Amino acid sequence: MSSGKITQVIGPVVDVAFAAGDRLPEINNALVVYKNDEKKSKIVLEVALELGDGVVRTIAMESTDGLTRGLEVLDTGRPISVPVGKETLGRVFNVLGDTIDLDAPFGDDAERQPIHKKAPTFDELSTSSEILETGIKVIDLLAPYLKGGKVGLFGGAGVGKTVLIQELIHNIAQEHGGISVFTGVGERTREGNDLYWEMKESGVIEKTAMVFGQMNEPPGARMRVALTGLTIAEYFRDVEGQDVLLFIDNIFRFTQAGSEVSALLGRMPSAVGYQPTLATEMGQLQERITSTKKGSVTSIQAIYVPADDYTDPAPATAFAHLDSTTNLERKLVQLGIYPAVDPLASSSRALAPEIVGEEHYAVAAEVKRVLQRYHELQDIIAILGMDELSDEEKTLVARARRIQFFLSQNFNVAEQFTGQPGSYVPVAETVRGFKEILEGKHDKLPEDAFRGVGSIEDVLAKAEKMGF
């Protein structure tokens, strides 16, 4: 194990010099620095660049407070390695695989794997055309998720990405009972804490491993924490042969941390100030999140859209890797429609008759057509009023408004805020409900009866309460 000495500390960047003739650590190797002689408090560094003359530039995974020039640095000879396997379920980790949930830490004999690996080879990959039922109507009908696919939840600030991810975790754990890995990347610590206690109360935590590198962490930790969560998920896929759900909130913060690290390393910025290696870094992460012949990883990633600009390089780079996109729209939030999923902008590779079936596909296509036509007529209605429309157009507008409200529903995880019980709607019920609205069976019911409900039976019950 070779050792060097710290020559420079600039925030999270630490330069380490190794003696002439010593073997230099490889890129991505983990180095360890002990702050004092007792060797109780250590800081992990990751090698990022070789500067020449035996000097390497590293990024710290923790705060560099207390580091001084001349401190000894040890090369571990391998990348950061984190615990894997069934023992990780029910536990909360940081980027280094250390437990942060106050329970007993993992011993040195626990099985660990490095966070840097190659993506599966082409002949190991597997494709599936099975739908993952979420119980959320707007997703299941118009942008269904594939088992083993990649899903992006796009949206600006405060439109409901995290709540939607929490509802998906709740529904999938309750209805499907699969193993989940939740990775919090550069998001609010409070939200992570709330999620942990909610999952503990509901019992879902027993089938979930949680990894956090939140907003207050150095950029190195925020950049690598997604790989820590992915490594845990890969073990369940490759060794245990399981179907795993990987939740990442938020993939934009991964890009943002990469941008900070790139600037700290002195690289010339690219478009909009992002790192020149943006596409490479995103590709290295996304290519590992895939399904193989041994098992599958279904990933659901929240992606923050800066200033609601979808052409920003960060969300635009992520788009290329996804099977389904769920776009959250601020205008729908203003209308009080939750989840605020834009039915026309959201898309899925799975919405094809050979995957979802002829009836589902036909109903989804007709719902989109009606909503698109309503969208086109809104300018006429705003300027001239409803009276200028033909009878056929008036009927279409009335049905479109009912469809728009019926696409909303109350969430189980938001019950404490709304006071309304959440609902899980099976796909068959969803398709039947929208088919009946399109056929005009519920034209006489008030629009308000369709807002925030589950199945079409709930609409009828709500209308009855309203006196219809």
From Swiss-Prot:
InterPro entries hit by this protein: AAA+_ATPase, ATP-synt_VA_C, ATP_synth_F1_bsu, ATPase_a/bsu_AS, ATPase_alpha/beta_chains, ATPase_F1/V1/A1_a/bsu_N, ATPase_F1/V1/A1_a/bsu_N_sf, ATPase_F1/V1/A1_a/bsu_nucl-bd
Gene Ontology annotations for the cellular component aspect, listed alphabetically: plasma membrane; proton-transporting ATP synthase complex
Subcellular location: Cell membrane
RNA-binding keyword on record: no
E.C. numbers: 7.1.2.2
GO molecular function: ATP binding; ATP hydrolysis activity; proton-transporting ATP synthase activity, rotational mechanism
Gene3D superfamilies linked: 2.40.10.170, Bovine Mitochondrial F1-atpase, Atp Synthase Beta Chain, Chain D, domain 3 (1.10.1140.10), P-loop containing nucleotide triphosphate hydrolases (3.40.50.300)
Principal localisation: membrane
Membrane protein topology class: Peripheral membrane protein
Keyword vocabulary terms for this entry: ATP synthesis, ATP-binding, Cell membrane, CF(1), Hydrogen ion transport, Ion transport, Membrane, Nucleotide-binding, Translocase, Transport
Catalysed reaction equations from the record: ATP + H2O + 4 H(+)(in) = ADP + phosphate + 5 H(+)(out)
Quaternary structure and interacting proteins, as annotated: F-type ATPases have 2 components, CF(1) - the catalytic core - and CF(0) - the membrane proton channel. CF(1) has five subunits: alpha(3), beta(3), gamma(1), delta(1), epsilon(1). CF(0) has three main subunits: a(1), b(2) and c(9-12). The alpha and beta chains form an alternating ring which encloses part of the gamma chain. CF(1) is attached to CF(0) by a central stalk formed by the gamma and epsilon chains, while a peripheral stalk is formed by the delta and b chains.
Annotated family: Belongs to the ATPase alpha/beta chains family.
Stated name of the protein: ATP synthase subunit beta
Organism: Streptococcus gordonii (strain Challis / ATCC 35105 / BCRC 15272 / CH1 / DL1 / V288)
Gene (UniProt): atpD
